[in-house]
Amino acid sequence: MLAGGNVVAAANDSWESLGLDLDGSVVNLGSILEPDVEQLIAAEPDFVIASANTDADVAMEETLTQAGITVAYFDVANFEDYLNMLSICTQITGRDDLYQKNGLDVQKEVEEMKQRADGSNPTVLFLRAASSNVKAKGSDGNVCGEMLADLGCVN
């Protein structure tokens, strides 16, 4: 979406947690932890973007490859990782304008926000809640924790 192209299938959290504006033709693959690979193949994607950190995504690589579907795995833990992924995806779609708009322009805003941090280094507790648990998360290896660290928070 941010890199161009059309979404043909997505996990249910795309609607439930992320609130993405996906039209009725997008196939709901079910749980992010147990996506329905048959439904994904039936949606006939040209290209699948998957998480390198989700066991179910990694497990479906062979099946998708055998079906002739190209899969790219990403580990996005911070803004630099996001920019790298966006760069690759906009190169694939040929939409350099979207790399500028959704990458470099946003990077300027991020840098402006970092400059606004007052240096007080507040102590925070970052909790990630899911339907079955709540976990305290550190500042490394996840987008929100990295953002808090960039703003000078002690997590």
Question: Language-model segments: which ranges?
Answer:
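A short, structured surface patch at a secondary-structure boundary
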Residues: 1-43, 47-54
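Short, hinge-like loop/turn segments at secondary-structure boundaries
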Residues: 25-28, 67, 90-92, 143
